[in-house]
From Swiss-Prot:
Protein name per Swiss-Prot or TrEMBL: Protein FAM25A
Pfam families, per database record: FAM25
Family listed: Belongs to the FAM25 family.
InterPro entries found in the cross-reference section: FAM25 (IPR023243)
The species this protein was found in: Mus musculus (Mouse)
Lineage: superkingdom: Eukaryota
Disulfides per UniProt: none
Gene name, Swiss-Prot/TrEMBL: Fam25a
Amino acid sequence: MLGGLGKLAAEGLAHRTEKATEGAVHAVEEVVSEVVGHAKEVGEKAINDALKKAQESGDRVVKEVTEKVTHTITDAVTHAAEGLGRLGQ
């Protein structure tokens, strides 16, 4: 009789241990999922910020080059016009 109670108690303890382990595993899975999700968001934000800065830098370079080319062409045309004006005098 006592052997049967011991076996029953051991089975009950094993069942509770299994349930507790399942609960702990589930909790860890949730935490890992949340951490991975957060890391993904942070990574995406960092990539987007880097791309935005690169785009802004590229836009600035294009603007500077365009201004320089425009200025150089304007100077060349002005110089040519002045030269033609002197020839016409």
